[in-house]
């Protein structure tokens, strides 16, 4: 198993997929999740995922929006593997801010929002599910005009 690819996939999962991944993780996946989330948080999230699986019927819909520190941004180059540029602290400390500028409201590089960081939002997503809410994570490029992100969110809610 390629741990980086596995974790990258986890960050892109919606709440239900994340719950399923926690409950069906084999030994290697469990080790990677414990390392990424922290052992105590991993156990709490796994418990919430089990509680959510036991629930039937939703109380309603909830959309979780991340803050500036909770969304993942990934750079896509035509000849290279995608690479996370936000939030990777080491990359930021080594000049990663240079990858983030916008020009005329658009990204200078091919960067897209690719996930909501489960380390920060996983417990919230799973706790809402365990309480019976139909829970969805919405990730967006926080660098762009908030009005455009709101329009995109409104379209997604209507789907």
Residue locations for each model-derived region?
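N-terminal non-catalytic accessory region
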Residues: 1-159
């Amino acid at each position: 198993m390629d741990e980086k690819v596995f974790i990258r996939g986890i960050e892109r999962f919606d709440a239900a997929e994340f719950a399923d991944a926690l409950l069906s993780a084999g030994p290697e996946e469990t080790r990677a999740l414990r390392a990424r989330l922290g052992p105590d948080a991993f156990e709490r999230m796994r418990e919430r995922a089990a509680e959510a699986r036991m629930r039937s019927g939703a109380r309603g819909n909830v959309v979780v929006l991340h803050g500036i520190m909770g969304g993942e941004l990934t750079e896509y180059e035509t000849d290279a593997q995608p690479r996370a540029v936000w939030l990777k602290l080491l990359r930021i400390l080594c000049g990663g801010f240079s990858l983030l500028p916008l020009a005329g409201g658009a990204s200078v590089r091919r960067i897209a929002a690719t996930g909501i960081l489960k380390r920060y939002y996983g417990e919230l997503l799973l706790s809402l599910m365990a309480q019976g809410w139909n829970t969805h994570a919405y990730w967006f490029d926080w660098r762009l005009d908030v009005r455009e992100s709101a329009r995109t969110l409104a379209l997604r809610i209507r789907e």
